[in-house]
Amino acid sequence: MAASFVIVIVISFFISLAFMCYVHYTSRQRRKLHGYGHEKAVRLPPGSMGWPYIGETLQLYSQDPNVFFASKQKRYGEIFKTHILGCPCVMLASPEAARFVLVTQAHLFKPTYPRSKERMIGPSALFFNQGDYHLRLRKLVQGPLGPDALRALVPDVEAAVRSTLASWDGNVSSTFHAMKRLSFDVGIVTIFGGRLDERRKAELRQNYAIVEKGYNSFPNSFPGTLYYKAIQARRRLHGVLSDIMRERRARGEPGSDLLGCLMQSRAGDDGALLTDEQVADNIIGVLFAAQDTTASVLTWIVKYLHDHPKLLEAVRAEQAAIRAANDGGRLPLTWAQTRSMALTHKVILESLRMASIISFTFREAVADVEYKGFLIPKGWKVMPLFRNIHHNPDYFQDPQKFDPSRFKVSPRPNTFMPFGNGVHACPGNELAKLEMLVLIHHLVTGYRWEIVGSSDEVEYSPFPVPKHGLLAKLWRDDTVSVETDGCQNGDNDDNGVAMV
């Protein structure tokens, strides 16, 4: 009896302690957010902050994140607050609000990532920074990713596409894994030109794969954990890159590729050359940005074309005409030909909208900011919700329908932001689209494929892709027929997709 009484007392103590912590936390939040440090009470956006310390993180991860954000928008409107991943956040789901944060008042919101992510990629990487350093570096990076450089890169992208499809031929494989290989190869040739030997390439691929596995892991530095292994692999990556830079300097040939441009740039403080650390951070950052996002979109494109057979035949007809002009594919694709793929380009735009690989982006308010009568407190995270905007019927009619014809007319300003917006928009977006165009050309004119198993479920790794990476069997078919009847005259296919 005495033991039971003691247990009751102990349990009651901890319940009381938890209740007092809750009261302390909520009262502290109210003082902080309703007049603390302000002459008048502030008005926060509507929403829920969830449980103390935990916030609404459990709700976010117990369901599709897009469903979580969509339900919040439906309940609270286009600006609402929440508390996730240990941070108070303001979510913005309107084009005007996204432009406010990313363009017109971008100086009030800094890019922000968890410290563990910065450590893994490198704190000097382009997308972790702002201000003069960011502007100098962005201008530098845009050179090797601009039209002139991409024009010369078409043969390399085409070679990478051919190699990827050839290795897949006759096999059942994860589409996502195949597309990751392709995106990595394109990233390597963009960074290093054609000057990287296979040994170095294998070292980079092997260590980057370990970094990638640990990117979303819990930041635990105990030996054996994914995070620990990723940090060790990141150090080895830095070592490989340092060796490559040392070899180039010894030859007196830094090169004109992205690595060479970074090595010769005076984008550092006070016009100084970038340090090897800064160069390595940016190379690893480019590899990260170039691989998973592009591979995810390519995976969805393969699925969307498979699921809409008449659309596939219309795309095949467009690409077959280009193939015929290239002597049945014996001649290489040209930059001009990639600019002429009108229907294929619309398919890519609709895939970017429909999949919305980048559902949102993180910013942090550097001062108290007022927007439409609401306060965004200093230090709060701010998240423009791209997917919510891309799937809003006010901007895209019947948004759950895959309809490339909607891009016959340009979307309303700030309603379509697959690569972000403002000074932090992805500088490699044209390279990504070139990769997609070349992949589609060779896929539809030389191969057939079928999806194995269900493709309706979605997984996050870390970007959304069909479950298991979209298992598919692909086989070579040089006799691919082109059935164009009704496919280029605005007819609907069997899946209700309007053709362009």
Curated annotation (Swiss-Prot):
PROSITE patterns: CYTOCHROME_P450. GO terms for cellular component: membrane. It is a single-pass membrane protein. The chain crosses the membrane at residues 3-23. GO terms for molecular function: (+)-abscisic acid 8'-hydroxylase activity; heme binding; iron ion binding. Heme binds at residue 426. It is found in: Membrane. Keywords: Heme, Iron, Membrane, Metal-binding, Monooxygenase, Oxidoreductase, Transmembrane, Transmembrane helix. Its cofactor is heme. Pathway: Plant hormone degradation; abscisic acid degradation. The keyword Transmembrane helix applies. It catalyses: 2-cis-(+)-abscisate + reduced [NADPH--hemoprotein reductase] + O2 = (+)-8'-hydroxyabscisate + oxidized [NADPH--hemoprotein reductase] + H2O + H(+). GO terms for biological process: abscisic acid catabolic process; sterol metabolic process. InterPro entries: Cyt_P450, Cyt_P450_CS, Cyt_P450_E_grp-I, Cyt_P450_sf. Its main location: membrane. It is an enzyme of class 1 (oxidoreductase). Its EC number is 1.14.14.137. Involved in the oxidative degradation of abscisic acid. Belongs to the cytochrome P450 family. This is Abscisic acid 8'-hydroxylase 3. The lineage of its organism: Eukaryota, Viridiplantae, Streptophyta, Embryophyta, Tracheophyta.
